[in-house]
Amino acid sequence: DNAKYRITYEGKWVNNPSIKPFIYTDSEMRLDIGEKATSFYDRTKQVKDSLMNEKAKTGNFDFSDLPKGGRFPFSYYKNYPSTGKSIQLESVGTTDYKCTENVETPDWQLIPDSATTIIGYHCQLAKTNFKGRTWYAWYAEDIPMPEGPWKLIGLPGLTLKAYDENKEYSFTAIGMSTLTAPTP
């Protein structure tokens, strides 16, 4: 499956929620959408990992010139390796972990009379309790794709902004494009 659409999000998260006020880390996150599969990943981390691998192949372990940032702890792939399955890849220190599970769709409550505009699209608000957090998502029915960042899927339009009730995680769309050259 090749990606046809790319949504770029500003991702913000708290590394240590016990420290107040919160200290946020941010990064450019991407959601690539294909016919069947989607991927959600930290763009800076992807570039950094690729450069590190290339340098390591040549025996060059000087990583001082690598881009800064790119610390979102995981990448998520829906309907990969097969329909109905997902993979979450997570790096902890120098160890990589892979978790394969069934795709779950959150049970969303649509909030009437809610409205905002995100990257030029009229959006409505929804709420769910999912994976131990209360999540809010602004979705655009004008973009009829039930996709969103991470596992926040299943709304009647593309999720352009999502955040948890405690404001420990947030993803806000800052751009959207159609990919002319399919991206695996």
Predicted regions and their residues:
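Extracellular or lumenal secretory-pathway regions
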Residues: 1-116, 122, 135-136, 167-184
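Structural motif
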Residues: 118-119, 130
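Gly/Pro-enriched, hydrophobic low-complexity segments
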Residues: 124-183
